């Protein structure tokens, strides 16, 4: 029981803070979403996509939009 509690405490402490390991994993996810937007020939905006474009996905979890021309 003591071992289980110790492991649970270690896991909670590791994942409760933005440690360098968790930060690196976050950046890997951001890079792949950005690359996916670039692959479909889109571009990233901080605001909503305007009229000649359409919203086709996201670039980052921080509410950035992947927009693509309608043509």
From Swiss-Prot:
Keyword Aminoacyl-tRNA synthetase (UniProt)? no
Q: Which Pfam families match?
A: Defensin_beta (PF00711)
**InterPro entries the UniProt entry points to:** Defensin_beta-like
Disulfide topology: 37-66, 44-59, 49-67
Q: What protein name applies here?
A: Beta-defensin 9
Q: Which UniProt keywords apply?
A: Antibiotic, Antimicrobial, Defensin, Disulfide bond, Secreted, Signal
Q: What is its main location?
A: secreted
An example GO biological process term is:
innate immune response in mucosa
Q: Name one GO cellular component term.
A: extracellular space
Q: Tell me where it resides.
A: Secreted
Name of the encoding gene = Defb9
The record's comment on protein family reads: Belongs to the beta-defensin family.
């Amino acid at each position: 029981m003591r071992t289980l509690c110790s492991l649970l405490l270690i896991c909670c402490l590791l994942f409760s803070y933005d440690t360098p390991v968790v930060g690196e994993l976050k950046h890997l996810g951001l890079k792949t979403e950005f690359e996916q937007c670039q692959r479909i020939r889109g571009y990233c905006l901080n605001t909503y996509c305007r009229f000649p474009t359409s919203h086709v996905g996201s670039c980052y979890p921080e509410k950035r939009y992947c927009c693509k021309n309608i043509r």
